[in-house]
């Protein structure tokens, strides 16, 4: 299916009906589907059913979903081969007044191993155009998967340059993204380790958990640790390993509760919820995990994440987390866990405030709806959706300094650990 194909009227009506039914059955917060939502559906129905192309249909349905003002909502066709900068290039950006070039998107996080980094795009570079089209806010750039795009950017020398960015095809249909280098470890200063985690792929996260543990072992007997979660937009339960590396014991982290549990006294019930407290070392043991949690799948009980009890580390008590406006979902789970349990000092910008459990569902004719199915609560009862986590030390992204190679946020982290 091409993006310019027209859809039969009955197809559009059927897909919209399925979208609304799926939201009614699975959406985590049913109170948001009341009169205001029904009015929005009535208002948008005409433009959705009159959408002339597949691309326009996706856009109109997405406009309707945006009225719910909730993260983790999305609508796309399974054959779609275009994605955002974050998903396609492994890079994030922010709106900035650049002076000479006006209001533009400026790259903030550029993950190693991603398409943007391979094309030598750097944090602080200004995006001017994509494939011959001028791109400026509020329009967001999108990139075709499995193809090469030509980007015009401005770097630290203030000169325009054209770079070719080749985006790999995604691994599956459910989530359109390309993995960057997931874990990077180094020693930026004497006795200080640095661990950057770009994302937490996988539902259980066996591979990412092993990679983080190996990186910590390779850092050796460090006396302080910087964990860089800037630009980490989340993932799965592999984040539990990172939390476990911040403390020696077993500490309850939190849980996600779907709409079935929304009206219940979770503070009184949470002690009875089953606990996920160990990531298997090998994927071949995942079936044992599935067997263990089979009753939970039947009862749909929330599952409490609990740290794995990995023992004392030489850097415990001297940890700094680097976060920014793009730190979201499972990465925010790590951040609030460290903050509430006084396991790390948080440096950088307020996080995204997007922390829900989510899934995607087929809604007919090749389309899928991504939607949040549960609210996440920390063990202390904090719900983060819509509430960014404030850093202990605010250090804003300074784009002009950053493109000159000065990372003030990292420098602040090193300063705190050297005290």
Predicted feature residues:
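Extended, small/polar residue-biased N-terminal targeting/export presequences
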Residues: 31-104, 148, 157-183, 419
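PDZ/PDZ-like domain segments forming the peptide/carboxylate-binding groove
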Residues: 82-137, 208
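Second-shell loop/turn segments in exported
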Residues: 2-9, 27-30, 44-52, 112-115, ...
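Sec-exported extracytoplasmic/periplasmic mature domains
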Residues: 20-32, 42-53, 62-73, 126-132, ...
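Stable alpha-helical elements in mature extracytoplasmic
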Residues: 11-16, 23, 40, 44, ...
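Conserved PDZ fold ligand-binding element
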Residues: 19, 116-138, 226-228, 338, ...
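Cleft-lining beta-strand/loop regions that shape enzyme active-site pockets
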Residues: 146-148, 152-364, 418
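Low-complexity, Gly/Ser/Thr/Pro-rich intrinsically disordered linker/tail segments
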Residues: 390-419
């Amino acid at each position: 299916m091409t993006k310019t194909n027209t859809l039969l009227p009955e197809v559009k009506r059927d897909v919209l009906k399925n979208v609304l039914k799926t939201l009614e059955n699975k959406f985590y917060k049913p109170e948001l589907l009341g009169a205001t939502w029904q009015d929005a559906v009535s208002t948008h129905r005409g433009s959705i059913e009159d959408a002339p192309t597949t691309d326009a249909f996706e856009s109109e349905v997405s406009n309707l979903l945006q009225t719910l003002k909730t993260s983790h909502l999305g609508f796309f066709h399974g054959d779609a081969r275009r994605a955002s900068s974050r998903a396609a290039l492994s890079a994030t950006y922010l709106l900035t007044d650049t002076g000479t070039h006006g209001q533009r998107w400026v790259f903030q996080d550029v993950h190693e191993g991603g398409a943007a980094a391979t094309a030598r795009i750097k944090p602080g570079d200004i995006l001017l155009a994509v494939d011959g089209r001028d791109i400026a806010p509020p329009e967001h750039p999108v990139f075709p998967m499995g193809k090469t795009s030509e980007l015009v950017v401005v770097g630290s020398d203030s000169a325009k340059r054209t770079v070719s960015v080749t985006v790999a095809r995604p691994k599956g249909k459910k989530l359109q993204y390309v993995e960057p280098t997931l874990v990077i470890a180094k020693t930026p200063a004497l006795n200080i380790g640095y661990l950057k985690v770009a994302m937490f792929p996988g539902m259980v996260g066996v591979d990412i958990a092993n990679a983080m543990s190996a990186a910590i072992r390779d850092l050796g007997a460090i006396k302080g640790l910087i964990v860089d979660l800037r630009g980490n937009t989340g993932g799965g339960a592999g984040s539990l390993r990172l939390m476990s590396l911040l403390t020696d014991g077993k500490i309850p982290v939190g849980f996600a509760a779907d709409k079935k549990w929304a009206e219940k006294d979770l503070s009184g019930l949470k002690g009875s919820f089953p606990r996920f407290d160990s990531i298997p070392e090998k994927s071949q043991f995942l079936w044992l995990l599935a067997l263990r949690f089979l009753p939970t799948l039947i009862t749909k009980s929330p599952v409490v994440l609990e740290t794995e009890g990995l023992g004392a580390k030489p850097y415990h008590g001297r940890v700094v987390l680097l976060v920014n406006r793009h730190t979201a979902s499972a990465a925010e789970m790590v951040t609030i866990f460290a903050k509430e349990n006084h396991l790390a000092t948080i440096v950088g910008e307020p996080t995204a405030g997007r922390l829900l459990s989510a899934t995607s569902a087929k809604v007919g004719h090749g389309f899928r709806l991504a939607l949040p199915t549960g609210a996440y609560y920390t063990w202390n009862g904090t719900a983060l959706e819509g509430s960014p986590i404030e850093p202990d030390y605010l250090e804003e992204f300074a784009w002009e300094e950053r493109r000159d190679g000065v990372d003030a946020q990292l420098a602040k982290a090193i300063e705190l650990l050297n005290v």
